[in-house]
């Protein structure tokens, strides 16, 4: 056995041992789901405005924010954002100030203030942050009403509520209620931010969108909006009642809305605006559920937007089985049991566009019962040995197949939620957040699941999905990944999915993708891509390689190249060097919630994807030796 193979086996053994030690008693794994400072800042604002005296929690949240502030006073959404981000800096500044632990006169606060003012002030922050500031009396509400009658119009209307994505809806409802009621939680302990912007605007277009949208043709959208505003007042009141019911019906057992901290925080404002007492059980439980999401990410206090328990457990269990751990091993069976218990069995919002399917999918977080998605479902189906729970497994597969979009691709949460009018909304990131279209990463990952499940390559749904991928390949040979960073992620998902479904190495799309991956490899054997790719919609290299992206690229190449190919061996060599399991290569965020706003560091990813790449390398090496 060569040195590289010995080192691979040694690293596999070490990683497997670590995962045995860190598995929870219920079979799950709990790794940090680390996003931006938004959650810490927003909870501080809410708690301080409510007069919540949980000083220890507020201090921890503020500590987490301060730890992310850079020496120049700015905050950024990802490490190589050299200039800083005005929205993140406003969030951090407002959160620190509202905590009562920092004053405007401190040097780091003065630096942040100067950066914000020099970048146009509060008017240039993302509209969700403007909303949060307005809900706390720190920014004026826009001269705009959002017609909540929108919630009660039937699906036959050209534009209706369920043509928005599920993650847009769950945030839109409390935001719209609070905005329409012009509700603000004002507390003298939340200092004014008037010094950051002397010309705060009520202009609805400036309030909702960025300047780059000025020249968009919105006439068709406004025509439908005008019709909504002409609906009788009684329907608007019905809309308010419907909004309240919509929120209350989607509260999870722990009190959170859809298990999201952000949506739950917004819901508290929405319910208060509707007259619900701050001392009511629903609000007390919502606050308790949100507070419980506080964790420690590398010794830094952080409020997770949700747990990632189902996702992490599914990915890790699959990676362990691929690394040679028997599916009878207690580590595997206990994780499978945990996952089986979280299969969703109720008809929820996904059924609006998919009314004939039986439930059976899985969601992302530990307590999610309302919001299954295709990515988690595909991951869980690969992570549960079919023989253990055959009925559950078949039900999950049936649900997943039913979620294929009419264009042949797969999206995250719902089916055929890609209406062109919604794309026209004058909101920042509407293209990313308001719709849920087919994506290359979801389509590739579902294909991988279907291929591993034994569906034949000529299965009509597989053929449609493969054709979707081929149609959506970029000119350079890559694929854009929506939920990971970014072109490396999309290309890995597409290639592994197509290989699992029998697409030949001689296919032009495969050849083109392999060429592209080789062309962007770094001299040290690594691959690294910036989060900026998601903003520019073109590949932007990092100045260094990351462990996770190198694992993606290496595994993608291994689908179609020999293990002794130079690009493969250099990539694997990078993965087995201990120094890459710390520092920037280890910690760079490679997940995406919302481009420009919410990048994610999944603390499980280095273990998941290095294991997968290394196990693929070892299995292919063994096959090549046999030949």
Language-model features, listed with the residues they occupy:
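Preference for long, amphipathic alpha-helical scaffolds in soluble/luminal domains
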Residues: 1-627
């Amino acid at each position: 056995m060569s040195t590289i193979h010995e080192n691979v086996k040694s690293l596999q053994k070490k990683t497997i041992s670590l995962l045995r030690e860190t598995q929870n008693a219920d079979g799950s794994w709990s790794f940090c789901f680390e996003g931006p400072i938004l959650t810490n800042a927003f909870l501080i604002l809410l708690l301080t405005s409510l007069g919540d005296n949980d000083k220890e929690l507020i201090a921890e949240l503020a500590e987490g924010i301060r730890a992310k502030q850079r020496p120049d006073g700015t905050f950024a959404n990802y490490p190589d954002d050299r200039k800083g981000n005005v929205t993140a800096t406003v969030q951090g500044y407002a959160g620190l100030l509202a905590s009562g632990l920092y004053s405007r006169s401190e040097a780091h606060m003065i630096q942040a203030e100067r950066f914000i003012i020099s970048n146009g002030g509060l008017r240039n922050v993302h509209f969700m942050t403007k909303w949060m500031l307005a809900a706390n009396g720190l920014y004026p509400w826009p001269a705009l009403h959002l017609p909540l009658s929108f919630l009660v119009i039937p699906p036959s209307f050209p534009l209706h509520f369920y043509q928005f994505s599920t993650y847009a809806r769950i945030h839109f409802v409390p935001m719209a209620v609070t905005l329409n009621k012009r509700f603000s939680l004002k507390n003298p302990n939340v200092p004014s931010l008037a010094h950051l912007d002397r010309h705060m605007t009520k202009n609805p277009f400036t309030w909702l969108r960025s300047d780059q949208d000025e020249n968009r043709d919105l006439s068709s959208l406004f025509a439908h909006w005008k019709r909504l505003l002409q609906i009788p007042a009684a329907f608007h009141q019905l809309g308010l009642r419907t909004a309240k019911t919509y929120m209350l019906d989607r509260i999870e057992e722990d009190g959170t809305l859809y298990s999201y901290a952000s949506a739950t925080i917004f819901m508290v404002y929405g319910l208060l605006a509707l007259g619900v007492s701050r001392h009511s059980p629903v609000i007390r439980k919502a606050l308790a559920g949100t507070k419980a999401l506080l964790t420690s990410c590398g010794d830094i206090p952080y409020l997770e937007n949700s747990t990632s328990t189902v996702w992490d457990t599914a990915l890790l269990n699959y990676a362990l089985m691929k690394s040679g751990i028997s599916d009878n091993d207690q580590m595997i069976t206990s994780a499978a049991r945990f996952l089986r218990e979280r299969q969703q069995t109720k008809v929820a919002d996904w059924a609006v566009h998919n009314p004939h399917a039986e439930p059976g999918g899985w969601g992302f977080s530990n307590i999610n019962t309302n919001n299954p998605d295709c990515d988690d479902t595909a991951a869980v189906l690969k992570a549960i040995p079919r023989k253990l729970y055959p009925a559950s497994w078949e039900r999950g597969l049936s649900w997943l197949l039913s979620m294929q979009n009419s264009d042949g691709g797969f999206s995250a949460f719902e089916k055929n939620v890609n209406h062109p009018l919604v794309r026209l909304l004058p909101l920042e990131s509407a293209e990313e957040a308001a719709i849920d279209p087919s994506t290359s990463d979801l389509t590739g990952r579902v294909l991988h699941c279907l291929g591993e499940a034994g569906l034949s390559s000529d299965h009509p749904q597989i053929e449609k999905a493969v054709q979707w991928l081929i149609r959506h390949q970029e000119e350079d040979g890559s694929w854009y990944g929506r939920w990971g960073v970014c072109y490396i992620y999309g290309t890995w998902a597409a290639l592994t999915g197509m290989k699992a479904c029998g697409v030949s190495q001689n296919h032009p799309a495969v050849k083109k993708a392999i060429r592209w991956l080789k062309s962007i490899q770094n001299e040290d054997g690594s691959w690294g891509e910036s989060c900026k790719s998601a903003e520019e919609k073109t590949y932007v290299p990092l100045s260094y390689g990351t462990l996770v992206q190198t694992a993606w690229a290496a595994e993608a190449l291994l689908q179609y190249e020999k293990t002794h190919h130079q690009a493969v061996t250099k990539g694997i060599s990078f993965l087995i060097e201990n120094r890459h399991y710390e520092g920037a290569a280890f910690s760079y965020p490679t997940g995406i919630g919302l481009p420009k706003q919410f990048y994610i560091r999944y603390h499980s990813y280095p273990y998941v994807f290095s294991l997968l790449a290394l196990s693929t390398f070892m299995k292919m090496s063994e096959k090549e030796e046999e030949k």
